[in-house]
């Protein structure tokens, strides 16, 4: 979880003074602290789903400390994102590059109108063990 959670006002990307806008315009402010970087029993997971919203065409930067703080060696990593209008773009490959380890797969983008059935159908179609 994010230590200093974003409020609705923080997420107002149309306001140049909102938290996300300030962070977007100044990369040095994108170091978003997490309450915990590595999930419990991390070493037991073979497959990891990494979900995030798209902000300005890239993965939302709060996910960066999770990616940088974990070793994905020996893990299959499947990115997915949400966005009202942007596609997945290069976000998954940029995260894979940032991680430097793991077997990163093609990801999926879900629109704001996606249902739990849409997500379940995608996951079931991955034919994971």
Question: Where in this protein do the model-derived segments appear?
Answer:
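Generic structural signal for well-ordered, non-membrane alpha-helical segments
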Residues: 1-2, 88
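Structural recognition of the beta-strand scaffold that forms the well-ordered cores
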Residues: 3, 47-51, 78-81, 106
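Loop/turn elements at helix/coil->beta-strand transitions in domains of secreted/extracellular proteins
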Residues: 43-48, 73-76, 102-105, 129
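A short acidic, glycine/proline-enriched capping/turn motif at secondary-structure boundaries
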Residues: 55-57, 84
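N-terminal beta1-alpha1-beta2 submodule of the flavodoxin-like/Rossmannoid cofactor-binding fold
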Residues: 3-50, 57-59, 64, 68, ...
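Short, glycine-/small-residue-rich phosphate/pyrophosphate-handling segment
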Residues: 78-114
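Short, conserved loop/helix-junction motifs that constitute active-site signature segments
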Residues: 68-74, 98-99
């Amino acid at each position: 979880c994010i230590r200093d959670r974003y409020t609705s006002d923080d997420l107002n990307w149309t306001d140049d003074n909102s938290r996300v806008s300030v962070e977007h315009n100044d990369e040095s402010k994108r170091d978003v602290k997490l309450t915990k970087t590595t999930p419990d029993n991390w070493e037991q997971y073979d497959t990891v789903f990494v979900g995030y919203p798209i902000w300005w065409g890239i993965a939302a930067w709060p996910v960066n400390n999770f990616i940088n703080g974990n070793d994905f060696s020996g893990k299959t990593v499947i990115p997915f994102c949400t966005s009202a209008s942007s596609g997945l773009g290069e976000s998954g490959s940029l995260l894979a590059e940032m991680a430097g380890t793991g077997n990163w797969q093609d990801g999926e983008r879900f629109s704001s109108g996606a249902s739990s059935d849409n997500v379940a159908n995608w996951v079931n179609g991955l034919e994971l063990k």
